[in-house]
């Protein structure tokens, strides 16, 4: 290292590499653990505290080292790329082979997987520990050679940088160690000094170099498959082959501590033997080193060519590095203290998560001590399934501290187990040359039979190297066997026939693993577990068919057999427990599913019941609503009916009231009409009591009128009709205009009963004067009203006639009275209750006036007054009976026919002659007086009296009366015997009434 030049450079802090950062931190006695960012921040803080500029840092750089490192890095990258491509192709082919061969049942697969994982862990651990040995040898060489301390520290820093950069992933994160810097002369000089201490084992350096080269390829997961396919017998040194035992002990920590103690004592015993043996052969080793110095250079060149044709171009640097590291480790392995120290500084970490990095382990274990190296390995067949870590601490105290603090703790969500790796890297066992050749031949044959297409160039180059290494190893083995007869006899007794013993071992245990100092990883190792064929040939199958070569093989095989038996039982129990737990989990899951399903069904049923209940409630509410609506409609209907009934009741009451008022009104009108008719009758009677005027009617031409008009007539028979007025009293008091047939029969009876007293008026009446039959006070009822003067020519004529006929007999008045009987019939039959008939006519006034009535004008004046009074009310009485006209001429004729009962009379003839009087007159027109006179002013219209009375009289008249129809000019035969006397008044004839005499 003295020849190397050192220069000073100025760089920025961000441009520094990890190795530069660690160098600066070590120079300042600071912690170098952590990733690049942590180191940069730590260095920046230190520079700022010193007052320096972080952007301008002075670095002491070796001029040769960067070039060498960059060259080596380039070679490694190229090797990685080429090797990775080859490994990817091989992996794809092996995956297809696995899929085609995977036909075993599930339990077999589980067992095979467990066994293969154990094998893979052991193979991986072999590779990992080989690299750890390199670190240890570098450290020991650093302690022995202080002048190379700085270079070794730089290499360690560069190694950490590569771990941080290329990284710590889920795959095996093994980084090959950087080469030592320096030229070839310095390397040769150092090599000579190192080889003086190793006399016997110089011949094995070639094998070690090849082993390291293959191991680097395996750990980088790049060209291991190429080396595997060549059928090369890859041999691993004793320090590497002794570690699968410890790895298996670490992977099976449950196997017990007794086996580990036996193995540890066995390793210690072998260490002592090897240490003594190493001291004995130092001198011979120095001489042999001088002789083989030139041969080593040739071998170096040959190794470079083989590595370039076989796997990659990094074989040159790795072989040189391996030689130096192995020579340093061989020199250090002479002492027991260093061996025991290195064996106890390694920690095995299991249970890591797939995303754990080596930097995480380094940071975690760095809290409890100084970490020399930290690596993460994984199962290459199933990346990410299981990850393990290997941590090398600086001292045993740090190891104990880490175990006590970190065992059974959690990292990245996974529980990790930290255990001490118990191994002996200085243990070496020697095997004979025949065993090597046999193992190599068998291995190559098996590789050819199983592999198919192999790389012939790689095979040939590796075979040449194997032959040279085996020849040299055979020579050195001969020397070693001469010096140590004890070991030779032991090995001879242990292995009397290597080929036969190997065959027996394969027959007894076809899948058994044959551990030893020179571990031969056979391909049939896949059959280790329970005799099943291998499922997949992974990249760790490359070292399987190797012959075991160590002196205590039988003892260790017995130990392995016992261990395998225990492991099988435990694995069986473990599988039974796992199966029971799996069944319990399945049962719990099924129960949970069933409970959840039943709960869901119950909830569904509950929801269904609730839905049905809500639906029923809704239906019930709808039904109740409809019922309420129906009841409301019924109530409204009943209310309408009630209101209709009330309305009808009110209407009925109103109609009854109207009817009652109408009846009262009609009764009042009837009463008024009755009074008027009574008054008219009285006036007519008063007028008839005077001299009857000359009748100018056309009936004068008839022979009836030409008879003697002064015929002697009985006064009683003359005035017997006066009794007819008595029937008018109270005749219409109980009349109802709605029932016109009510008095059809009863009226006759009542009138008959009222007139019984007038049947025989008595003899006293016959001698009385005529005017005494009249009531002399009938004109006094209207005296209070002023008399209206009248200029009626007929009255004048009447007075003149009466004056001329002073001595006219009373028969004339009788005749006139008979005429007026029809008038009384037409005027109305209502009797005035105020007028008393009968014997009131026989008052003294009438007797006093009986002699002088013709010559006086008082009576005519009274009649004029009475007539004047009647002119006031023609309209009122005419409105009450609008349909009662046209019958004035009906009742007049029988008054004349009663005089001659044997004569047929033309009824209505006079009515036909007096038709022009019908619109204005009721009674007076019958007399045939002048038409159009003023008398119709004071008479009620013909529609009142005559029509009304005709209707009232039409029902009960059976003899000589006509029907109520206004049939004028009707000719009726009236037989003489059909009408009695006294019927001329227009009323029915009464039984027992005396016939009128003329």
Curated annotation (Swiss-Prot):
Q: Where is the composition biased (Low complexity)?
A: 335-344
Decide whether keyword Cytoplasm is in the record. Answer: no
SMART domains attached here? RRM (SM00360), SAP (SM00513)
Q: Where is this region: Disordered?
A: 48-208, 233-348, 417-546, 683-998
- Give the top-rank taxon of the lineage listed in the UniProt record for this protein: Eukaryota
Locate the RRM domain: which residues?
345-423
Where does it localize?
Answer: Nucleus
Which residues are in the SAP domain? 13-47
Output the Gene3D superfamilies linked to this UniProt entry. 3.30.70.330, SAP domain
Example GO molecular function: sequence-specific DNA binding
The residue ranges flagged as biased composition, category Acidic residues, are: 80-90, 98-122
Q: Name one GO cellular component term.
A: nucleus
- Provide the protein name: SAFB-like transcription modulator
Gene name, per UniProt, is: sltm
